[in-house]
Amino acid sequence: MTEMYYYKEPYAKSISATVTAVTPKGLYLSRTVSYPEGGGQPGDRGWIEGVPYSDTLHEGDEILHVMKDTSRFKAGDTVTITLDWEHRYDYMQQHTAQHLLSGLMFTNHGIGTLSVHQGEDILTIETDRGEIEEDVLLKLEDEANRAINEGHRVYYREMSHSEAEGLGLRRSIKVDGDVRIVVIEGVDMIACGGIHTASTSEIGEICYAGSEMIRGHVRTIWRTGERAKAKRRSDAALVKGLSALLSAREDSILAAAERLAEENRQLKWTLKAAEEKGAEILLASGCDSLFSSPYPLSAFQPHLKDGEYFITHTESGRTGWLFFGSQERFALLKKEAAALALKGGGRAPLFQGVSALSEEVLLESVREILR
């Protein structure tokens, strides 16, 4: 059985150990500082004698350090395992933040936690509610950051299953036998096998990032620690850049963007009207029934009333086509669809689609078929 040294010394970054087994999947050690995946927290990564391992997993009573190349190791070797501490500490902060948020949700707002996920960018907490007002979640953000500033102690207690059940925890206990209780002093108490910071102050900050519905429940989204700081800074840079781009004060960016969007809508309508007028004039001029158009094919649709037309237009590097005519005549084109590289269809008298051929080649080929 691997000695779980990460429980004894959560802040230990390196330790010596003996290799107990070597497998194609990785190494087993006599003891480790590397936390294995569990409880929504990903496994640690790092180096064993300078050789990187990418993950840490529970394998029964043993802990596997996932490694691509184990050829230099053998059972009995004494090795030094070193954590990717930045990665580990990031998830210690995030896991502690999750306990803090879930505890405050339950104690202050009566909201239970169903599941959690600690990702590379965000922390998510699925709640037992089908609806939560936005101002409740913003208040929760304030409460969490207040608790961070207060620096509540975080510590562990080991006790029997029956003792733990008598504590009235906010979630049921999922393990048999003795239970490890994580306590955020004055805030939360829960059974958990994860690794946490020693104080809420080490979380740094918590930022509410939104919510979404999943399985009929509200899932809340958060950023913590360095992630929250990085997002705050990137948002500030974005606002500053938009302010310069729109020549507007930071508090006027939204209004400036709305004006720009409205101008863009008006320009699109003006352009659409001009294209349709150009298409109308082109058709009225007695043009060839097969031609390449400078206007989008949609501009012709309001003006096609009679006759037969095959029109092409290239947009975004693709040859679009429009055929106005009878079902029987379109059947001639469909018969040669492979040769024409045609895709699309429709219903008489209007058919349209795209072709892999250039406009010039497509028009020449269609002219031969429909002549």
Q: Which residues are covered by each model-predicted region?
A:
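A glycine- and charged-residue-rich anion-binding loop/surface
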Residues: 1-371
